Amino acid sequence: RLLSGQSDDGSWNQSVKTTIQRLFGLHLTVRNPTQPIDKALGWLMALAFKEYSPIRKDISQRITSRDLENLPFTPGCFGYFLLGATLFLASIFGREDDTRVQEAYARLNQEGIKKKGRWCGWSCNNNVLRAFVVHPRYSESRATELAVHALSRVQDDSGKWPRVVPFYQTVNALAHLDSPTARRQVAKAFRHLLRTQNPDGTWGRSRKEWNTFLVVHALRRKRLL
């Protein structure tokens, strides 16, 4: 079903959003890259890396929560969403050593260092951090370290971040990392989650199923399940 309707160029209807949604769904089900997945990644990478010189903060192309159902990405600039999602998908499907992927990570790493871990606003920032935490080398980069420290400075003692920080996506992203700063934040966030779990076992007020998936995945990353 996820492969149905794929165009000859590898995309689904020449749509960035639909192609990213299909690829993420395939990551959850197929796991290993196949020819259709490689073709879709090729289409997405060609578009993302063309757009990356430089990132365009085009307000008319902002990504909203409605575009992101069942995706680990959050509302923000189209450019950072496209690049972050593409690098994330390239890394989880085994393309982390591709020259273009490495070049894009290197440029984002330098940008993250220059901006002290804040590529953009908090929600938009998640889309870049999401790509960094799944890369074998860049998960330990200076930009990742700075982004994690930036989050630690705004997390309160209860384990929450400000409302502009996407809570469930942030917990899930940080759970991929082993740095002391990430571990401390995750531990505090888990205590908050323990206190706020719904009676039916889910989390959140809306998109409960997706929030719960992100929490369970984070718990598994930390070998607590």
Tell me what each language-model feature is.
Residues 1-225:
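Preference for long, amphipathic alpha-helical scaffolds in soluble/luminal domains
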